[in-house]
Amino acid sequence: MKKQYNLNLATPPQRGGTAMLTMDAAAVSSGLAFLESELEKLDPLLREPLTSTTYPRDIEIESGGGWVEATSAFNVEYSVTGGQADGVGGIQNAVRRIQADLSKDLYKVLPYEVSMSIKIQDQLRGAVTGRSIEDIYNDGIRLDYDKYMDINTYLGQAAYGTTGLLNDKQITATSVTAGASGQTDWAHKTPTEILNDIDEAIIAGWTGAQYDNSAIPNHILIDPANFAYINRTMVSVNGYPTPVSIMQYLVDHNIAKAKGVDLVIAECRFCIGAGVGKKNRMVAYVNQRRFVGMDVPVPMSRVMTQPNVGTASYDSLYMANVGQVKIHYIDPFIYRDGI
C-alpha cells in the first residue's frame, strides 16, 4: 500500500482564500526522478554482446562470381601405359604413352538473407537521442553474418547437407595415443608427448600426400582450454621450469619447421567436443587456397530499401551468396581426437 504523507494544516484566519496544497510521496518521487535525469551524465558507448569470429584466419576466401547455385573445381590424375619403372627407350618396341583422367567436383552455394524494418518515428527520434536505430540494426546484421560464416566454415550447414573444417565425412578421425599417465588429454601429458601428437598428425598428412613438401600441414586448430594450457605452462628440465612455454617448444621443434614450414597453432571453440565421443578434436591441414578454401560469390551487402506504408516503416534487405567449404585434398587433412 502506498503511504500518503499528509501535512496537517493550521486553521488560518478566514480571509476568503483556498486551503494550502499538499504533495504525496509519489509526486515528490517523480519530481526527483525528473531532476536526476536532467543531472545524469550519458555514456555514449553502446555495449554490444561479447563474442568472437575466427573464420578469416583459418580459411582463404575467394569473392566474386554472382548469384550462382554451385561452384566447381577440376582435378586431374596422370598415368602412363607400361608403368613408370619401364622408361628406357631404344631397347623396346613400344613407346609409353601418357594419359590424363579429368574429374570435376561440385560445391553448393547458399544465399544468406536478413531484413530489418525501422519505423519512421524511430528514425525521427534518432535526431533527438543522437543514436541511430539503423546503425544499431546494421551492426547486429554484420555480427549475425560473421557468426553465420563462422558456423559455415567450421561445421557447415547441416540442414543443407554441407560440412566444414571440423566434420568432413570423408576424413577418418583417430584418437591420439595415450601418454605415460595412461590418458590421451594434453593436461596429463609431458611436453614431449604433446609434441609427438603434433608431429604424428603432420607426418600423417605428409605421408598421405606422397611426401609432397607443399602438402605438409601448416595450420593446426585446437580447443581454447588446451591452447591456454600450452601457452601458460613452462617446459621443465630435471624438474625445474624454463622460460620457454610448451607452445614455443612445439613451434620451434615440430617436424614441419624442420622442412621449412612455419606452423600455426590456433584456438578454435568449435573444436570443443567435436571429436568422437564428444572428445576435443585437433585438426591439421594446409591453409592454402589450393588445398582448402571457401567461395563467397556475393559478399554481404544491402540490396534494397523501400518504404512500407502499411507498417509506417522503411524495410531493408541484406543478402550474400556463400559457398560451402571446399577440401580439395583429403589425404593431408588430419583429425585427431582426445587431446
PLM-predicted stretches and their roles:
Residues 1-58, 231-339:
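Sequence/fold signature of self-assembling virion shell proteins
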Residues 26, 30-33, 37, 107, ...:
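Alpha-helix boundary/N-cap detector
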Residues 32-114:
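Assembly/oligomerization interface modules of large self-assembling protein complexes
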Residues 113-197:
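Alpha-helical scaffold segments that mediate packing/assembly in large oligomeric complexes
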Residues 117-119, 221, 317:
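Residues in well-ordered beta-strands of folded domains
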Residues 145, 149-152, 198-209, 250-254:
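Hydrophobic, Leu/Ile/Phe/Ala-enriched alpha-helical segments that form helix-helix packing faces
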Residues 166-242:
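Extended, solvent-exposed, turn-rich assembly/linker loops in the middle of proteins
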